[in-house]
Amino acid sequence: MNLLPGPEQLEIVAAAGEFLAERLPVERIRANRHAETPVPEALWRECAELGLLTLGLDEESGGSGRSIDDEVLLFIELGKRLASGPFLACTLAARVAARCGDAALSERIGSGAATVALAVLRGDGDVRPIKGTFDLFEPAGALHALVVAREGTALVDIASFGPLTAVAAADPGIRMCSATVESAEPLHWLPAEDERIWERATVLAAAYLTGLAAAAAALATQHAKTREQFGKPIGVHQAIKHACVDMELAASAAQAQTLFAAIALAGGRVDALLQVLSAVTVAGSAAVDNAAAGIQVFGGMGYTFENDVHLYLKRAHVFRHLFGEPTDVLAELLAQDRAQ
């Protein structure tokens, strides 16, 4: 099986990467850290016009109709560029709205006219009806929230969450709130029997984590090549070069596993869940470990606010916990492996 991207896929990724580098550079995260939203409305519409939210949406629903492995490559690029904003929530929400027959809402989300917050259940609760305590990501300006669960996915009127309590996120590129819901009915409900959105969401989160891992490795390697001590690049030392190689290998393994998980999910393989859990486990570890190792390669500079590498570590911790605690995911992965 060839897991290498083809020429057309590389063109899509290159176009997205150029746009993100120019319009959403990493420097914006620090500059806009006190803004209500990480991405201004006009810029968000530009992202939508480029097709960043609808790459995998059916053409009849206004999307590009590309496969999930193309979406994976896009989300890897989003991770590499440390792209802020509700890319994951809006990509999934446009799909859920279309599958539930709400073409108007799907079009508004896909065009960037409406944004959707991602609501993550913390602790005990339920998704139908909606009840429990939730963390909401990028709720400012959103009219709806997306709740992704194993049994199905809900699009919910964000007013159903009641008063939102602001949460200070460690990542300056993310806006968070928390809310406790007694009971609320979703606007749209897409059961897992109709489409496995939880698995799709987990694969795309793994792809973003893969991008973070790759970017952290690239930053550290470039620094090791150019930073000199005693007249030599620090990369000549085995402790540094071995760390950089390990980081590159971890990022490559994460990309291969995530692409394979996407193919397994799209093909309806019996081991699709195993592959999805493997992807988010491998990618999550690669992202966190690479960013942490990158800070060490940068030395004292890696701990400063002006350096980018710590931003990758903070974002990795957020995405790693979106659709399941890592220890729970690992336990289920081991159980799945024994059952194969």
Annotate each predicted stretch with a short phrase:
Residues 85-101:
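N-terminal glycine-rich flavin-associated loop
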